[in-house]
């Protein structure tokens, strides 16, 4: 959509009036001017009388046009963003305002609108009862439809078998290789409890299928327990799997055919004739996912064009009401159909929509714009508005639009559509559906922390909304042709009564889904004389190959198999018909009586804010598709850009300004974001003294008060989100969505650690370390910075914070918020500067009691060596918590859905310009699907926009600075020189290209490697390496990934549970992700941190982190924290029992040593390794935290008592023990029982530097401990932590021996 700038000269007074008026309503002057022009134009175009016009016109003739030519203005941050905000009419603003309104506001209003007058209500109930009774008493539908319906009824989604069938249906037909197909069948069938379904269904087919699945299940089970399976295996032998594959394949195709009208449009038109003869009509839908590439969009365009020609010819002049029509999905016609890409959608998608509509008009067939996700509703209305005013379509009534009753905005959308029909002088076809994206709408709102849901949380509210909306549509027959899509007998009957008895052709129609609604509507379509209702029904008929059926089929199965759906309940003979056809208005009123208020949300679906229960709030997000939120954000951003930000040292006493350095926007060198001054040596010393002096005051503050201060900081930070976003976008090159996520993560850290100290800590028993240095990175300059500080403060430590030198301004704002919340000035201090000066001065000071660092592995190693020789007054080594990088891989097999893989790869590899510790670095594709996946990935990369993140349209911003850009480009060049295939792509845009020359941009890059181990180190930027692997060598691939030494994140995309178990069971990685992206770990949901070269642990935003920041605490402290969590959610401790067998052997052996026996018992009770906990999180996702034992612990003691104390602790956790090869240890080992001695390894003193161990426990003198710490720190490889104790001490910290593994599974993939 072309735009132009029309300059208007204003005097200063008028300009100030506009600015002042705009700020009063939290809008920008640009918005106010645009909105005023829009409103005035609308009035003029609608011929409204404007009293000021006559006077103005008479005096205006002599005035000259003062529109000036646009002039080159200095760079103003966020100006383009302000210009992208759209003006709205009153009706459109009402739609936006209703987006997430509380159900308690929306439902009472709907009840009045949906209520049927007394006689009509009774008639509707009577008719509904008759329809339902006939439907239930009908012989089960014959043939294929009956078989499939019985099968779906028997295997409901609440059963494991139902889910297995759905996973099979979703994936089987698209897998190219037989081996993976067989693995999927084996995986889904061998674990099913098929016996429980035998004989339960009256349908022969279901019983036959169940027997087949039972035999198959036995046949493919990995454990051949029964003689039945052995004999079957003998009979079928090697020919078994192909037979089974054929059988299952046939069953899946059968299900496919049940829901799809034909594989091609010609086949579908032929199949439709039978029901057309009975009076049914059709609307055809070309199946497929949303387009991700230009090629996808073009293919769908051609498919729609061909379909319109075919349908048009078949229609043969029957017209829009009597003849067939087509439904189109706008997301299939453009790869970037979203609010952020508004101009592209209008310039590129709109002409396609217009040409399809003109083609439909040529044949006079109806064309319906399908409804999609809630955030696409308003942009679809803009496209519709434009279409309705096309001169070539004037007077034609075939334009159709779909609206969803489950959306709270639906009634307001109808008001707008009626107005649009009036203004464009046409009758619109409006299909009213209930809505098919409910699960994903709930999940998205929860994940993004939005203020509410766009949809109702109770099915019955949607039913009420549907009736209220139906009434509105029926009230304007001259403007709207209503199309009621429902399978619910009560809804059908109510609409039949509301529409009146004097029906005329073209008044309205019903609609149903192919394969689901025909049995009900066979009672509706046809002559009254034949006992029918004589009302038309149009069948929504999907067309496409079985391979394109997947997403559609799963949506239908979810909808059909959901136990609240009419289709599911009608088949349940135990449910009384009266209940089945109950009036939803009465049902809601009954609920209101029980609950004391109408419209209360579903008790099991908390608002996004309350996702984590009463313990803590979820951080609030910001919806970048909501026009009101965008307008308000734009105003705040322009204000934030006027502020000259500063980062001075923030000490207990104010400091002088001194010589300041500019902080420059990496995307635009002309933009000076603010100024920074490095802390001097004297200021560092002053800060250290203050930290020491203030430490006792802060520690003495009760944990509840410390928690309250952190909670206050969270509230302040959330309220300042737009301002903080402004700094993040300009200083760190963050896109808006990344900036929102960053502020939210910082807020979540404050809530999480505050909650933990409030509930679990006591100053009498939990003692802090003392002054702690926090060194944070530039890639998460607010989130990680705040996370480190919040944890240290929560635990009672004073903090010296050194932000990354590239991002001091956002850090200064973060500290200002903490001070405003009530943290005393000497307790938190900010020391901007370089690592080699300020960082080195802080960490090398003897008075520092702990170091928290996020950054490179090399710097972490230097820090560890720097502090290794320092012990605290109790003789304990100084702790370093380091979170470093990773060579993160994603493994994709041929059962994965390519579209989903590509979306997740784009987010994981290129979001934040690849500058995340967790970002995907190596994509591992199974050979059979590599080419197909890469073709789609390259196409999707070409659709990404790279440029200034201050625009809403930008997907990929700059890398942090020129040095980072140089390093990345050097790597790419080196790979090219080695002959590797390098592909770089980004959307061509002249405006963006100008910025690329000045800013530090690197386009998304794809490099194909021969093998994983070709990559020797992490490349921190938008560079994705690809390797292909053979299905049979998956274990070898995981070994290579482990061999890199890093262990931060790993992704798996597969539909095979066995593969998930195989990878997650053998990968040595801190954060695992299944069938989802692998970035954006959420505090407390996916605790974050790696192992090996990727970090020391414990995980940030996890239950163990705060314990690392204490100098002492009760023995059972960790257990208390876990017990509190376990009271809310289930605990799986199966593995713990297995791990403790050697400890039990030691306990029995220690019969004559009561102290050791008691200690074994104590450690056994305290040990948490081998436990798996379910963590709170959004719907459609399963998050767990598993505690595993470290592999091998070096135990150093000079007497038998201490050696046994160490042995008991290590065995309680389940690790191997590494003993120095000395007489003491050798003699002791001989005495121990076999189960214990098998867990012990020996190493000679000179071999220790090269021996593998990942933790150390020492009892003895402090001088030797210091020496040991230095030796361990001097080793190459991962940082290993050392616990040091005086002789005889038994308070060993078992949590230091755990490895934490976080696993996040997208359970919505394949409807699992």
Swiss-Prot record:
Keyword Ribonucleoprotein carried by entry: no
Active-site residues, Swiss-Prot/TrEMBL: 883, 917
GO cellular component: cytoplasmic side of plasma membrane
Domain of life: Bacteria
Region annotation Aldehyde dehydrogenase: where it falls in the sequence: 653-1119
CDD domains recorded: ALDH_PutA-P5CDH, RHH_CopAso-like
Record GO terms (molecular function): 1-pyrroline-5-carboxylate dehydrogenase activity; DNA-binding transcription factor activity; proline dehydrogenase activity; sequence-specific DNA binding
SS bond partners: none
GO biological-process terms attached to the record: proline biosynthetic process; proline catabolic process to glutamate
Catalytic reaction(s) noted: L-proline + a quinone = (S)-1-pyrroline-5-carboxylate + a quinol + H(+); L-glutamate 5-semialdehyde + NAD(+) + H2O = L-glutamate + NADH + 2 H(+)
Protein's recorded name: Bifunctional protein PutA
Gene that this sequence comes from: putA
């Amino acid at each position: 959509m072309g735009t132009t700038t029309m300059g208007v000269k204003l005097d200063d007074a008028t300009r100030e009036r506009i600015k002042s008026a705009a700020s009063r309503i939290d809008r920008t002057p640009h918005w106010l001017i645009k909105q005023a022009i829009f409103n005035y134009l609308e009035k003029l175009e609608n011929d409204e009388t404007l009293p000021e016009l006559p006077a103005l016109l008479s005096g205006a003739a002599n005035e000259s046009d003062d529109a000036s030519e646009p002039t080159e203005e200095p760079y103003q941050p966020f100006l383009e963003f302000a210009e992208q905000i759209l003006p709205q009419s009153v009706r459109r603003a009402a739609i936006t305002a209703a987006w997430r309104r509380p159900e308690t506001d929306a439902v009472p209003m709907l009840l009045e609108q949906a209520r049927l007058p007394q006689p009509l209500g009774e008639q509707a109930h009577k008719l509904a009862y008759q329809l339902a009774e006939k439907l239930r008493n009908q012989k089960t539908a014959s043939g294929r439809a009956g078989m499939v319906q019985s099968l779906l009824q028997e295997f409901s989604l609440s059963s494991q078998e139902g889910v297995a069938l759905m996973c099979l249906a979703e994936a089987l037909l698209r897998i190219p290789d037989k081996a993976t197909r067989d693995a999927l069948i084996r995986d889904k069938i061998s674990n099913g409890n098929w016996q429980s379904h035998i004989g339960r269904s009256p349908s022969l087919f279901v019983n036959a299928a169940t027997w087949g699945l039972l035999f198959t299940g036995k046949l493919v089970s990995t454990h051949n327990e029964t003689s039945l399976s052995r004999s079957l295996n003998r009979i079928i032998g090697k020919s078994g799997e192909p037979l089974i594959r054929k059988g299952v394949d046939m069953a899946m195709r059968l299900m496919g055919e049940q829901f799809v009208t034909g594989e091609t449009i010609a086949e579908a038109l032929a199949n439709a004739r039978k029901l057309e003869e009975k009076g049914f009509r059709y609307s055809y839908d070309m199946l497929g996912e949303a387009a991700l590439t230009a090629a996808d969009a073009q293919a769908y365009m051609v498919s729609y064009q061909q379909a319109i020609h075919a349908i048009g010819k078949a229609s043969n002049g029957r017209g829009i009401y009597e003849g067939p029509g087509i439904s189109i999905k706008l997301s299939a016609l453009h790869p970037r159909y979203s609010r952020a890409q508004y101009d592209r959608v209008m310039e590129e998608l709109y002409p396609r929509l217009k040409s399809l509509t003109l083609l439909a008009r040529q044949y006079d067939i109806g064309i319906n714009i399908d409804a999609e996700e809630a955030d696409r509703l308003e942009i679809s209305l803009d496209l519709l508005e434009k279409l309705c005013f096309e001169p070539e379509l004037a007077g034609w009534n075939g334009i159709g639009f779909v609206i969803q009753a489950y959306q709270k905005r639906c009634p307001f959308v109808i008001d707008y559509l009626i107005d649009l029909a009036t203004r464009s002088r046409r009758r619109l076809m409006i299909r009213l559906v209930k809505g098919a994206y409910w699960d994903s709408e709930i999940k998205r709102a929860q994940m993004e922390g939005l203020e509410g849901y766009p949809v109702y949380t109770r099915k019955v509210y949607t039913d009420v909304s549907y009736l209220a909306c139906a009434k509105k549509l029926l009230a304007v027959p001259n403007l709207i042709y209503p199309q009621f899509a429902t399978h619910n007998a009560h809804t059908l009957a109510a609409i039949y009564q509301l529409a009146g008895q004097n029906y005329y052709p073209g008044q309205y129609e019903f609609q149903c889904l192919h394969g689901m609604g025909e049995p009900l509507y066979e009672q509706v379509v046809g002559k009254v004389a034949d006992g029918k209702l004589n009302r038309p029904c149009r069948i929504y008929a999907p067309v496409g190959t079985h391979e394109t059926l997947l997403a559609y089929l799963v949506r239908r199965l979810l909808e059909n198999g959901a136990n609240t759906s009419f289709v599911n309940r009608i088949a349940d003979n135990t449910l009384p018909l009266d209940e089945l056809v109950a009036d939803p208005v009465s049902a809601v009123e009954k609920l209101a009586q029980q609950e004391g208020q109408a419209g209360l949300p579903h008790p099991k679906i908390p608002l996004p804010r309350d996702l984590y229960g009463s313990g803590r709030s979820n951080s609030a997000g910001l919806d970048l598709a909501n026009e009101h939120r965008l307008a308000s954000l734009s105003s705040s951003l322009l204000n934030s850009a006027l502020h000259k930000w500063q980062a001075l040292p923030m000490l207990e006493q104010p400091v002088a300004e001194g010589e300041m350095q500019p902080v420059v926007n990496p995307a635009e060198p002309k933009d000076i974001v603010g100024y920074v001054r490095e802390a001097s040596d004297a200021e560092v010393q002053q800060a250290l003294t203050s930290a020491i002096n203030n430490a006792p005051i802060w520690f003495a503050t009760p944990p509840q008060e410390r928690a309250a201060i952190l909670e206050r900081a969270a509230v302040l930070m959330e309220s300042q989100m737009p301002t903080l976003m402004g700094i993040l976008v300009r200083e760190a090159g963050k896109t808006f969505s990344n900036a929102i996520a960053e502020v939210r993560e910082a807020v979540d850290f404050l809530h999480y650690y505050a909650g933990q100290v409030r509930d679990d800590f006591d100053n009498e028993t939990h003692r802090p370390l003392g002054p702690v240095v926090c060194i944070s990175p530039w890639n998460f300059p607010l989130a990680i910075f705040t996370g480190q500080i919040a944890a240290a403060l929560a635990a009672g430590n004073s903090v010296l914070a050194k932000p990354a030198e590239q991002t001091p301004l956002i850090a200064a704002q973060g500290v200002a918020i903490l001070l405003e919340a009530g943290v005393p000035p000497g307790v938190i201090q900010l020391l901007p500067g370089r690592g080699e000066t300020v960082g080195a001065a802080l960490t090398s000071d003897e008075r520092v009691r702990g170091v928290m660092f996020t950054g490179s592995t090399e710097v972490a190693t230097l820090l560890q060596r720097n502090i290794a020789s320092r012990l605290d007054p109790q003789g304990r080594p100084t702790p370093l918590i380091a979170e470093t990088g990773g060579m993160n891989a994603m493994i994709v097999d041929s059962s994965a859905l390519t579209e989903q893989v590509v979306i997740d790869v784009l987010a994981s590899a290129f979001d934040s310009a690849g500058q995340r510790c967790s970002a995907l670095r190596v994509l591992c594709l199974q050979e059979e699907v590599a080419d197909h996946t890469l073709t789609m990935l390259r196409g999707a990369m070409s659709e990404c926009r790279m440029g200034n993140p201050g625009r809403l349209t930008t997907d990929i911003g700059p890398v942090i600075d020129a040095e980072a850009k140089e390093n990345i480009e050097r790597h790419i060049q080196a790979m090219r020189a080695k002959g590797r295939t390098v592909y770089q792509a980004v959307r061509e845009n002249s405006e963006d290209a100008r910025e690329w020359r000045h800013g530090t941009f690197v386009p998304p890059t794809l490099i194909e490697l021969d093998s994983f181990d070709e990559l020797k180190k992490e490349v921190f930027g938008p560079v994705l390496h690809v390797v292909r692997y053979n299905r049979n060598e998956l274990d070898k691939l995981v070994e290579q990934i482990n061999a890199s030494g890093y262990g931060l994140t790993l992704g798996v995309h597969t539909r095979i549970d066995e593969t998930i178990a195989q990878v997650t069971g053998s990968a040595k990685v801190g954060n695992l992700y299944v069938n989802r992206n692998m970035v954006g770990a959420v505090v407390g949901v996916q605790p974050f941190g790696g192992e090996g070269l990727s970090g020391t642990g414990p995980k940030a935003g996890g239950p163990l982190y705060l314990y690392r920041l204490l100098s002492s605490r009760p023995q059972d402290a960790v257990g208390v924290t876990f017990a509190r969590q376990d009271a809310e959610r289930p605990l799986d401790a199966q593995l713990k029992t297995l791990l403790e067998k050697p400890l039990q052997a030691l306990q029995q052996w220690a019969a004559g040593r009561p102290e050791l026996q008691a200690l074994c018992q104590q450690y056994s009770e305290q040990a948490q390794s081998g436990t798996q906990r379910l963590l709170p999180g959004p719907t459609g996702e399963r998050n767990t935290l598993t505690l595993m034992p470290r592999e091998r612990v070096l135990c150093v003691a000079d007497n038998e008592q201490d050696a046994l104390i160490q042995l008991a602790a290590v065995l309680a956790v389940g690790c191997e023990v590494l003993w120095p090869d000395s007489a003491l240890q050798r003699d002791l080992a001989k005495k121990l029982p076999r189960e214990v001695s098998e867990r012990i390894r020996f190493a000679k003193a000179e071999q220790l530097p090269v021996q593998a161990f990942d933790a150390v426990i020492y009892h003895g003198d402090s001088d030797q401990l210091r020496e040991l710490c230095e030796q361990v720190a001097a080793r190459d490889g991962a940082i290993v932590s050392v616990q040091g104790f005086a002789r005889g001490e038994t308070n060993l910290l078992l949590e230091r021996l755990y490895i934490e593994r976080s696993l996040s599974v997208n359970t919505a993939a394949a409807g699992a």
